[in-house]
Structures are given as structure tokens and as C-alpha cells.
Amino acid sequence: MSRPIRVIVLILISGSLFVPALRPAEELLGPVGREAILAHDPSWAGAAAAYQPDPAALDKLRGLTREVRIEVYFGSWCSDSAAHVPALFKVLEMADAPLLQAACFGVPEVKEKRAPYFQGREIARLPTFLVLVDGREVGRIVETPERSVEADLVRILGL
């Protein structure tokens, strides 16, 4: 390869290293619904569609006898949120358990601006799924599930 062509190729390659990752420009902040989250970034909808929850765990979640609320604190800019929030949505959809509900809260990327979005909760990493039974926290999934979203929920709920 001639020297001028090598220089051009080198410039093109090095310039591409500084292109920011493509993601939606606007952060999702505060209370936000499932549909808005999935519409915000199509890759999240794809991740939800592709996720295959464990059928045995889903059966256990369907057997809930008490109301369970999951408070989901996530960052629309966060790769761990992009992996695990869509998985939770698929679990909720496939479990189809009326007593299992989620409320989602978007959090800013800038750490110094996050406190008001945590509603007084102690949250250090995202996503954080707070699992509440009768309004009392019984467990949480922080950043990455130990096994899977559905298996961790079953464990936390003692099902």
C-alpha cells in the first residue's frame, strides 16, 4: 500500500475511535413507564423480545399470594440497565401475575444530580431493583442479578 493511502487509512481509523457510542441524546428521568422506556431506545425493546425467562421461575411468580412491588432505578445511558431492565419487563410480561408490579424511575448519568431521584432510598449502583412486599423492602437486585432476574426474584420472595 502506498504511503498516502496508508496515511488516509490511519486517519480514518483513528478518527473513528473518537466517535461517541450511538445512543439517544435525552436521558429518561423520574417516573417513566415501560412503553416509554422501550420506545426510547430500540435496542432495549429488542433485548426484551429476545430474553427467555426460566419457565419454572415464572410458574413460581404466578403463584404469588401477596402484592409485590418492584421499584426500578435505572439509567437510560447505563449498559447494565440496558441488559437487565428489559429482562425484567419480559419476566413481568410472561409471568402475567397481577400481584407483581413494577414502577420505574430514570436517574441522571451525573452522580451529583441523582439524590432527588432516589426518593430517600440508599442506592449506589444502577440498575437497582427494590423488591417490596406490603410496602416493606425484602430484598434487592443491584447492578447484575446473581443468577437471573427471575431466579433472583424467586429467591428474594422465598418462593
Set out the residue ranges of the language-model regions.
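Bacterial N-terminal signal peptides that target proteins for export
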Residues: 1-8
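Bacterial N-terminal signal peptides
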Residues: 8-17
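N-terminal leader/targeting and pre-domain segments
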Residues: 23-65
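Stable alpha-helical elements in mature extracytoplasmic
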Residues: 57, 84-87, 149, 153
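Local sequence-structure signature of Cys/Sec-based thiol-disulfide redox active-site neighborhoods
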Residues: 63-94
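Thiol-based oxidoreductase modules, predominantly thioredoxin-like and allied folds used
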Residues: 72-76, 99-113
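Structural alpha/beta surface segment adjacent to cysteine/selenocysteine redox centers
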Residues: 113-126
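Non-catalytic, surface beta->alpha helical segment in thiol-disulfide oxidoreductase systems
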Residues: 125, 131-159
